[in-house]
Design a protein with these regions (language model features):
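Membrane-anchoring hydrophobic helices of lipid-metabolizing enzymes
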Residues: 2-88, 93-119, 123-126, 194, ...
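Non-catalytic C-terminal accessory region of glycerolipid acyltransferases
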Residues: 2-37, 130-275
């Protein structure tokens, strides 16, 4: 086929995709105002991820078409990769995912309504179990703010002895799906590892540390195999099992230590690490 023919096919595909997206948004607003708002933001985030990070997601088929699952992920300095993941879920799967966020976000003026619209909860186990028993997906990062601030380009998991998320999965009788995004630490980096900011967080639990970045590095999100519900496993055992699964994704898909220049060049790499 000629170059002109290829360009025509590409433009036709883009026009078709744009038409379908517009129809989806129109239908969403007709059905529900908040649903329309969610899909509009999802479309914007999806476009941003594609343009700025060449965002890819591998293993999306492991997310159930319906029914609950607990998605456990590594927390970057700014979890922008998680927003791209949520957008992809809405657009490609037609599903929303409830998310657990640190309580300090709910104290930001004017932010609470936005969090409620996007089904963000501050994490009591009972509320998490309720969301899963109602058939929703639920995303949580056991490392939370601590991992966001104090982890670095060597990608250590800072979960401590946290096992509440595992107890939630057991009580809800749902599978756990591990998730990790390649180069998320190269997109944004935190200076929380510096002794002063570490002391502030450890002593006063103040999530205050300079963050720099916004670099257009390659982002690839990888979903691991679901860990099925096991009635005979303890929360501590499941927590360890999930941590090993997330660590396995890091080992397989992330070059350690992370490097910003290399992550930028990976925008031009056809095959991800581990493939």
């Amino acid at each position: 086929m000629s170059n002109t023919g290829n360009q025509s096919c590409l433009m036709g595909a883009e026009d078709t995709l744009s038409f379908l997206r517009k129809n989806q948004l129109r239908e969403a607003y007709c059905n529900n105002l908040w649903d329309g708002a969610r899909k509009t933001l999802a479309t914007l985030w999806d476009g941003h991820g594609a343009i700025w990070h060449g965002y890819e997601i591998h293993g999306l088929e492991k997310i159930p078409v319906e029914g609950p699952a607990l998605i456990v992920y590594y927390h970057g300095a700014i979890p922008i990769d998680y927003y791209y993941f949520l957008a992809t879920l809405i657009i490609q799967k037609g599903r929303t995912c409830h998310s657990v966020a640190d309580h300090f976000l709910f104290k930001i003026p004017g932010f609470k309504l936005l969090l409620e619209v996007f089904s963000v909860i501050h994490g009591p186990q009972e509320e998490c179990v309720r969301a899963l028993r109602n058939g929703h997906l639920l995303g949580i990062s056991p490392g939370g703010v601590r991992e966001a601030l104090l982890s670095d380009e060597t990608y250590p998991l800072l979960w401590g002895k946290r096992k509440g998320f595992a107890q939630v999965a057991i009580d809800s009788q749902v599978p756990v799906i591990p998730m990790f995004t390649q180069n998320v630490r190269e997109g944004f980096r935190s200076l929380g590892t510096l002794s002063f900011f570490r002391w502030l967080y450890e002593r006063f639990r103040l999530p205050v540390a300079p963050i720099y970045g916004g670099f257009p590095v390659k982002f690839r999100t990888f979903l691991g195999d679901p860990i099925p519900y096991d009635p005979n496993i303890t929360a501590a055992e499941l927590s360890e099992k999930v941590q090993q699964a997330v660590q396995s994704l890091i080992n397989q898909h992330q070059r350690i230590p992370g490097n910003i220049l290399r992550a930028l060049l990976e925008r031009f790499q056809l095959k991800p690490k581990g493939h």
